[in-house]
Amino acid sequence: MVSLKNWDNKTWLSSNKYIHSFNKFILKQIKLNKYSRVLDIGCGRGKIIANLSSKLNLHYKPIGLDIENHKDKSKKIIFKNTDALSFISKTKLKFDLILIKQTIHLLKKKEIKKLLYICKNKLNANGKIII
């Protein structure tokens, strides 16, 4: 896997306009409710899922994974400084939404296949993976 320290620092990916627009897109793709479980692979600072959590008043804090331990990460999520394959292979949790955004292109083909296979098996009924 590749480490790109602070690659999205102060860019459009962190802008409120982009975050709101992306969450609007997510909510058009999948019906989520306050008891939905959300995982964001390559979450960066976690702003997207933190905003989604606030919007839906999620009961369970969303989980964000990133290989970079950002100092200014959101306090509204459970942040795990780990690689996706390690976490997703070990967790017993199932999710209604798994986001893999701005990340998958950093993986090798073999890692992508393995990650998608494991993610598929970690979805609740009617859960979705959004890439």
Positions of predicted regions on the chain:
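Conserved class I S-adenosyl-L-methionine
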Residues: 35-44
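Class I SAM-dependent methyltransferase Rossmann-like catalytic core
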Residues: 2-21, 25, 29
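Short catalytic micro-motifs in class I SAM-dependent methyltransferases
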Residues: 102-103
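Class I SAM-dependent methyltransferase SAM/SAH-binding core
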Residues: 45-86
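Short conserved loop adjoining the S-adenosyl-L-methionine
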Residues: 86-92
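A conserved beta-strand element that flanks and buttresses the S-adenosyl-L-methionine
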Residues: 99
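Conserved beta-strand signature within the Rossmann-like core of class I S-adenosyl-L-methionine
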Residues: 126-131
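A short glycine-rich, Lys/Arg-flanked "PGG" loop and its adjoining helix->strand segment in the class I
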Residues: 113-125
